[in-house]
Swiss-Prot record:
Quaternary context: Homotetramer.
Annotated residues for binding of ATP: 16-24, 44, 126
Positions with a binding annotation for L-citrulline: 96, 101, 132, 136, 185, 194, 270, 282
GO function terms (MF aspect): argininosuccinate synthase activity; ATP binding
Protein name as it appears in the record: Argininosuccinate synthase
Organism: Shewanella sp. (strain ANA-3)
Catalytic activity: L-citrulline + L-aspartate + ATP = 2-(N(omega)-L-arginino)succinate + AMP + diphosphate + H(+)
Lineage of source species: Bacteria, Pseudomonadati, Pseudomonadota, Gammaproteobacteria, Alteromonadales
Keywords for the protein's UniProt record, in alphabetical order: Amino-acid biosynthesis, Arginine biosynthesis, ATP-binding, Cytoplasm, Ligase, Nucleotide-binding
Cellular component annotations (GO), alphabetically ordered: cytoplasm
EC number: 6.3.4.5
Length: 407
């Protein structure tokens, strides 16, 4: 397989490296295409699992990289990306909690930081030319490092399939454990795991049991419900079952508690940023419990107009995160608005976990606007029901005038 040598002056490239077939082939392709440039492999540890990192450095060096930087981003990812996004109430197209989307800006930022550290003049990613991630990564690169060249092999090389990649590596005697048959495309981090491809490409196919890897099948989940307590401060989960935990530890504990109950599974067909639709199955056990708890506290503490505003902020934030616009003035504005609203989002919630469901069944807050004295229908001294008559007349004044004018 012939490779065109571009000899463009690129001397050192930082590659977002996973150790999979694509990025294993990218390393020798870069060296051949860009005049034997130096390749620095970079891997972001965002909680995808230790098994994904074992032997990664050795694999990168064997493929031709001169260095491999594995950067631990787990705590920062949850604290500075997941928690702020969840506080806005962001949920894409009503169902997707943005697990993959939220990870892209922190990975891109860390990749740029490694590039600056090693003096690289180019960045490279292995995203396909059909997906969202190419836009997310390159949008972040544009905001953080507009001076660095971006290389996207899937938009440049002539290889079209896994068979092509395997043949390419075999020609160069580069070993890989990958095979031509890859049923699903998966992406995992501390928050979730996504599944695409294979049988899922036909929306008439029900996902088989083999699709799901993180959560139990709700049909096989325990017949006994489990209750979990979450304490929230300023829109952030700080304690689980009374235990004070860091953001990452809290998420991991909730994942471990909720996954056996089949909590957090969704099967959706979403609108990609690039215009096409795609089907994905997502597992987000701990995040689903957190989301339920935060919304329960908001029901107690946010007045009608504040909650409407929070919903608008969440809708904007969902599209912004999905579309890869984290490092923008709009993102800063939305996060600032959310922080203001979250000042009163404090309290405790008990969530019931049962066969795929996470339901907030108890909630209390020192900032609660709910008052039993005001809300009950019995006789009381704090609310005179006669006051409602004047309010209703003023509230419906425009409708009254419109009707009178129509006569």
């Amino acid at each position: 397989m012939s490779i065109e040598n571009k000899n463009t002056g690129v001397k050192k490239v930082v590659l977002a490296y996973s150790g999979g077939l694509d990025t294993s082939a990218i390393i020798p392709w870069l060296k051949e295409t860009y005049d034997n440039c130096e390749i620095i492999a970079f891997c972001a540890d965002v909680g995808q699992g230790e098994e994904e990192l074992v032997g990664l450095t050795e694999k990168a060096l064997a493929s031709g990289a001169s260095e491999c930087h594995i950067v631990d981003l787990k705590e920062e990812f949850v604290k500075d990306y997941i928690y702020p996004t969840m506080a806005t109430g962001a949920i894409y197209e009503g169902t997707y909690l943005l697990g993959t989307s939220m990870a892209r800006p922190i990975i891109a930022k860390a990749q740029v930081e490694v590039a600056r550290k090693v003096g690289a003049d180019a960045l490279c990613h292995g995203c396909t030319g059909k997906g969202n991630d190419q836009v997310r990564f390159e949008g972040c690169f544009a905001a953080l490092a507009p001076d660095l060249k971006v290389i996207a092999p899937w938009r440049e090389w002539t290889m079209q399939s896994r068979e092509d990649l395997l043949a390419y590596l075999a020609e160069r005697n580069i070993k890989t454990s990958a095979s031509a048959t890859k049923i699903y495309s998966r992406d995992a981090n501390a928050f979730h795991i996504s599944h695409e491809g294979g049988e899922l490409e036909d929306p008439w196919n029900e996902p088989s049991k083999g699709v799901w890897t993180l959560t139990a099948d709700p049909e096989d989940a325990p017949n006994q419900a489990e209750y979990v307590s979450l304490e929230v401060e300023h829109g952030r989960v700080t304690k689980v079952n009374g235990e004070a935990l860091t953001p990452y530890a809290a998420l991991m504990k909730l994942n471990a508690i909720a996954a056996p109950h089949g909590v957090g599974r969704i099967d959706i067909t979403e609108n990609r940023l690039v215009g096409m639709k795609s089907r994905g199955c997502y597992e987000t056990p701990g995040g689903t419990v957190m989301f339920a708890a935060l919304r329960a506290i908001e029901e107690l503490v946010l007045d009608k107009t504040s909650r409407t505003w929070r919903e608008q902020v969440g809708a904007q934030m969902a599209h912004l995160v999905y579309d890869g616009r984290w490092f923008t003035p709009l993102c800063k504005s939305l996060l600032a608005a959310s922080e203001s609203l979250a000042e009163s989002v404090n309290g405790e919630v008990v969530v019931k976990l049962y066969k795929g469901h996470a339901i907030a069944v108890k909630k209390r807050s020192p900032n609660s606007l709910y008052s039993e004295a005001f809300a009950t229908f019995g006789e009381d001294q704090v609310y005179d029901q006669k006051h409602a008559e004047g309010f209703i007349r003023l509230y419906s004044l425009a409708s009254r005038i419109r009707a009178l004018n129509a006569k």
